[in-house]
Amino acid sequence: MNNKIDNFLKQKKLIKVISGLNNFNTTHVIKIAKAASKTNASFIDIAAAPKLVEKVKKEVPNLPICVSAIKPELFVPCVKAGAELIEIGNFDSLYNQGYKINFSDVLSLVKQTRSLLPDTPLSVTIPYLLPLNLQLELAYRLEDLNVDLIQTEGKINKITSLLDNRNIETILPTLASTYLIANNVTIPVICASGLTISTIELPFKLNASGIGIGNAVSKLNSTEEMINLLNEISTRINYSTVL
């Protein structure tokens, strides 16, 4: 695991910036990456495209890159291009297209991925569609398969800003998953989907090691706005972890 990422995990202060599984707009992704690199963001998670990895790596060499996909064969050229982590997941954008994934699918994808890249740090998203008991069972199985990170998720509606005052009920599924998994397995857990400024600290109270932020950052117009938002997130996380 990259030393920078490992340190954030140990401190339970990891911030993962997600540009989007289906976002292949190089200019936009680099814009997000540059903003992330000027803050305490731990790494950026981008679409699994080798040329995109190369361009982001060239423009922002100090920011670790993770690539997300649901096709294991896509990971190999991306790692060769400079990606340091790989992730099976960030399914949000796929659910709206009717894509479904079940318990067995995840295990199969992990095994296929590990056969191709046995030593590359691997993160896996636990599908929110699974009942909580199956989510925990899947987490145990992922632990046996030496997965390095687990990400939780929940169903979210379109959001325009991380500053939106959203009711906590909208993120209860991902918080419940985070609490259950983070307190029962040794794999670090990242909580994602629907977090806002008012709820950004909650996952850390539930023993999460980090958070994933996507739409709220990517929908901002300027790099400066992205930097300001990520700095605000970092400040709140630092404050919450010292209390």
Swiss-Prot record:
It comes from Cyanophora paradoxa. The lineage of its organism: Eukaryota, Glaucocystophyceae, Cyanophoraceae, Cyanophora. InterPro entries: Uncharacterised_Ycf23. This is Uncharacterized protein ycf23. Belongs to the ycf23 family. The keyword Plastid applies. It is found in: Plastid, Cyanelle. Keywords: Cyanelle, Plastid. The gene is ycf23. GO terms for cellular component: cyanelle.
